């Protein structure tokens, strides 16, 4: 029996039509939903990977659209996942840098301003002796590895303070130890002081004054300065509010340099203006923690001024709603008014980012110790436990973790962007605890051994570098951000004598050397954002979007750490080369700018003076030319924004408070 169609025609034609529609629907479904199985997150099984490779040969653009920026189009043969990842990274960088990368170059770079070298500040001796005198093995051209010993527990001012509960105001009034403004000085008598060294130190101090004074003139209370246009700048990480990022980030550097007047101006602004109350800012949990909480904590350790403890706690409290996830892994962004938190849309299916949620431990642990409130430490311990217990592919930590499911996102690993400071905080949490947090040291060693095995490589030209790893494929590229790891490996070597000590030190020196090479292979003598290793090039950027330099500190951080640990003069020489390059290319009449292309003889400037230039770049350079007794590495551990935090049990400035027990336990 024939069914009659609505228009009264026989349905044999209708069946053919149905077939055709069915076919079209199946094809559409395949095109729409087939991609789900081919997304990078689902690369867990070989079968899917094989299918993906098969289709990739046929034309990857079917599933993964080509990058939109034609001008930045990578080489056609490149793995499309690398393209996707780079796009996401670019988005993150854009979010950090605001519109700076897109801006038309401003007219006129400005000439270096006249600078006035201040008379040397009176230098009080540092409170505790420097890194123990270590014998230098000069014959072999390098120092024997010194070991920064664990402090003797209980034998320190911090433990004495903790046994005498006081209010913060009482503590401050009763003259708790205060680091001398000027941060301590050179141990040598002035007449035996190396004149050149002192000149270099003073030069860096003058750079800080130049950066600060222009920020004050044109952007006071705003987040950052645009030196060319002489107006404020704010990256989206600061939530579009005037949070005085440069003040909070740069203040401990002023203190260390003994710039008292400037320091007092900054303190005054924080007291009168800094607050996150009654604003609805969407802040980056990570950036707010490392710059604002970290900066305030250091200032509290230096001075004992309760203002800084209160502000640190105030900021940390605003971040706490971000931790309310099924796993306790925090979201990346939080609204300071509503407490609504979320992740970046681009981060592997709603994942949190390893380098962000893994870089809270130092600040939150210290905040608990100085406030007596265990809550902050509990929050970061939860993150630690998740990361300890989760299965690590080949012993490595992927960059993305879903805070709802507790499962890894894309299997991309990096010691540069998206991964970097997680590894840093494992070692430093152990150091900060006075080498008692053994769990952290074990996790650090396990992670670094896997990285040594799977990601550290040597180029044909003999340069040691850390590759990114993406689904078992090495991308022979290193971010400038990963240049901090030279210092990290060296610090790992210097603090524990074991089977890996020599390897860590060798790799630490090798990476630092490679980062230096990336600088001196550019005509500006400043290093690019990322550099590659191929048959054609070594330690050079290849793509236009990785040729910029935004006043980053990581290479100088490694010079500083390696100098302290080896006393090899070359690290100071390299630091001075960098100072000259910064002065030649980045200095303007109204502050310091990054460069758009380090390979040009006369590169355009980017018109942003990053807050980390004052917090990190200038601080590390200043310390490089300072005596070891200024912030000795066996008493201070630097957070990832170069804010030094005291080491428990070794440092009189730890200022531990008595633990405040919950009411139910108090009786
Ligand atoms: C800083 O904000 C911190 O060092 C962070 O860990 C990553 N890099 C920037 C400066 O380059």
UniProtKB/Swiss-Prot annotation:
UniProt binding sites for Ca(2+): 640
Biochemical pathway: Protein modification; protein glycosylation
Catalytic EC class: hydrolase
Region of interest: Disordered: 154-192
Gene of this entry: alpha-Man-Ia
Catalytic activity: N(4)-(alpha-D-Man-(1->2)-alpha-D-Man-(1->2)-alpha-D-Man-(1->3)-[alpha-D-Man-(1->2)-alpha-D-Man-(1->3)-[alpha-D-Man-(1->2)-alpha-D-Man-(1->6)]-alpha-D-Man-(1->6)]-beta-D-Man-(1->4)-beta-D-GlcNAc-(1->4)-beta-D-GlcNAc)-L-asparaginyl-[protein] (N-glucan mannose isomer 9A1,2,3B1,2,3) + 4 H2O = N(4)-(alpha-D-Man-(1->3)-[alpha-D-Man-(1->3)-[alpha-D-Man-(1->6)]-alpha-D-Man-(1->6)]-beta-D-Man-(1->4)-beta-D-GlcNAc-(1->4)-beta-D-GlcNAc)-L-asparaginyl-[protein] (N-glucan mannose isomer 5A1,2) + 4 beta-D-mannose; N(4)-(alpha-D-Man-(1->2)-alpha-D-Man-(1->2)-alpha-D-Man-(1->3)-[alpha-D-Man-(1->3)-[alpha-D-Man-(1->2)-alpha-D-Man-(1->6)]-alpha-D-Man-(1->6)]-beta-D-Man-(1->4)-beta-D-GlcNAc-(1->4)-beta-D-GlcNAc)-L-asparaginyl-[protein] (N-glucan mannose isomer 8A1,2,3B1,3) + 3 H2O = N(4)-(alpha-D-Man-(1->3)-[alpha-D-Man-(1->3)-[alpha-D-Man-(1->6)]-alpha-D-Man-(1->6)]-beta-D-Man-(1->4)-beta-D-GlcNAc-(1->4)-beta-D-GlcNAc)-L-asparaginyl-[protein] (N-glucan mannose isomer 5A1,2) + 3 beta-D-mannose
Function noted in UniProt: Involved in the maturation of Asn-linked oligosaccharides. Progressively trim alpha-1,2-linked mannose residues from Man(9)GlcNAc(2) to produce Man(5)GlcNAc(2).
GO-annotated cellular components: endomembrane system; endoplasmic reticulum; Golgi membrane
Name of the protein: Mannosyl-oligosaccharide alpha-1,2-mannosidase IA
GO molecular function ontology, one term from the record: mannosyl-oligosaccharide 1,2-alpha-mannosidase activity
One BP annotation, GO: ERAD pathway
Residue spans, topological domain Cytoplasmic: 1-18
Biased composition (Low complexity): 156-178
This protein's record includes keyword DNA repair: no
Cofactor(s) needed: Ca(2+); Mg(2+)
UniProt similarity note: Belongs to the glycosyl hydrolase 47 family.
Membrane topology: Single-pass type II membrane protein
Sites carrying sugar chains: 278
Organism in which the protein naturally occurs: Drosophila melanogaster (Fruit fly)
Compartment(s) of residence: Golgi apparatus membrane
Cystine pairings recorded for this chain: 483-515
Lumenal side: 40-667
Tagged with keyword Hydrolase: yes
Tissue distribution of the protein: Complex spatial distribution during embryogenesis, including expression in lobula plate giant neurons. Also expressed in adult wing and eyes.
């Amino acid at each position: 029996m024939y069914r009659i169609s609505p228009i009264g025609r026989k349905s044999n034609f209708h069946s053919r039509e149905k077939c055709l529609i069915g076919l079209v629907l199946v094809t559409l479904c395949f095109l729409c939903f087939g991609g789900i199985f081919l997304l990078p997150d689902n690369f867990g099984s070989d079968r899917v990977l094989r299918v993906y490779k098969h289709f990739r040969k046929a034309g990857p653009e079917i599933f993964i659209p080509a990058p939109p920026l034609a001008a930045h189009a990578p080489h056609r043969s490149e793995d499309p996942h690398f393209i996707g990842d780079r796009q996401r990274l670019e988005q993150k960088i854009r979010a950090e840098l605001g519109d700076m990368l897109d801006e038309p170059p401003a007219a006129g770079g400005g000439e270096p301003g006249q600078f006035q070298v201040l008379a040397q500040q009176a230098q009080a001796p540092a409170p505790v002796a420097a890194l123990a005198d270590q014998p230098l093995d000069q014959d072999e051209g390098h120092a024997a590895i010194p070991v920064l010993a664990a402090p003797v527990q209980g034998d320190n001012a911090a433990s004495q303070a903790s046994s005498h509960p006081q209010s913060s105001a009482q503590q401050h009034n009763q003259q708790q130890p205060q680091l001398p403004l000027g941060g301590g000085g050179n141990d040598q008598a002035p007449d035996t002081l190396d004149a050149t060294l002192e000149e270099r130190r003073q030069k860096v101090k003058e750079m800080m004054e130049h950066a600060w004074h222009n920020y004050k003139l044109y952007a006071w209370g705003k987040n950052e300065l645009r030196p060319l246009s002489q107006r404020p700048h704010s990256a989206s990480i600061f939530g579009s509010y005037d949070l005085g990022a440069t003040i909070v980030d740069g203040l401990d550097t002023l203190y260390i340099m003994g710039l008292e007047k400037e320091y007092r101006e900054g303190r005054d602004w924080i007291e009168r203006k800094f607050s996150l109350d009654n604003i609805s800012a969407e802040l980056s949990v990570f950036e707010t923690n490392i710059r604002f909480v970290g900066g305030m904590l250091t200032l509290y350790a230096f001075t004992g001024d309760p203002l800084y403890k209160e502000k640190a706690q105030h900021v940390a409290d605003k971040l706490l709603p971000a931790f309310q996830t099924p796993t306790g892994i925090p979201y990346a962004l939080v609204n300071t008014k509503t407490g609504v938190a979320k992740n970046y849309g681009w981060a592997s299916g709603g994942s949190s980012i390893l380098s962000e949620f893994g870089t809270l431990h130092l600040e939150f642990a210290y905040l608990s110790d100085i406030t007596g409130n265990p809550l902050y430490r509990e929050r970061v311990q939860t993150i630690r436990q998740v990361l300890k217990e989760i299965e690590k592919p080949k012993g490595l930590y992927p960059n993305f973790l879903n805070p709802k499911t507790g499962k890894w996102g894309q299997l991309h690993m990096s010691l540069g962007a998206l991964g970097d400071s997680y590894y840093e905080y494992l070692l430093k949490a152990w150091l900060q605890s006075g080498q008692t947090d053994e769990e952290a040291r074990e996790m650090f060693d396990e992670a670094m051994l896997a990285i040594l095995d799977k990601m550290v490589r040597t180029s044909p030209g003999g340069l040691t570098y850390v590759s990114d790893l993406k689904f078992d494929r090495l991308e022979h590229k290193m971010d400038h951000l990963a240049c901090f790891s030279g210092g990290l490996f060296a610090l790992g070597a210097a603090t524990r004598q074991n089977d890996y000590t020599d390897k860590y030190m060798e790799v630490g020196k090798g990476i630092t050397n490679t980062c230096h090479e990336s600088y001196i292979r550019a005509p500006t003598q400043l290093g690019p954002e990322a550099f590659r290793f191929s048959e054609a090039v070594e330690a050079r950027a290849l793509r236009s979007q990785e040729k910029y330099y935004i006043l980053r500190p990581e290479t100088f951080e490694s010079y500083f750490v390696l100098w302290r640990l080896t006393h090899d003069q070359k690290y100071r020489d390299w630091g001075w080369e960098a100072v000259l390059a910064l002065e030649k290319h980045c200095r303007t009449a109204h502050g310091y700018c990054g460069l758009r292309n380090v390979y040009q003889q006369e590169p355009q400037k980017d018109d942003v003076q990053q807050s980390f230039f004052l917090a990190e770049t200038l601080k590390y350079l200043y310390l490089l030319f300072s005596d070891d007794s200024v912030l000795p590495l066996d008493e201070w551990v630097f957070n990832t924004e170069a804010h030094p935090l005291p080491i428990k049990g070794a440092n009189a400035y730890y200022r531990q408070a008595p633990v405040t027990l919950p009411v139910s336990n108090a009786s």
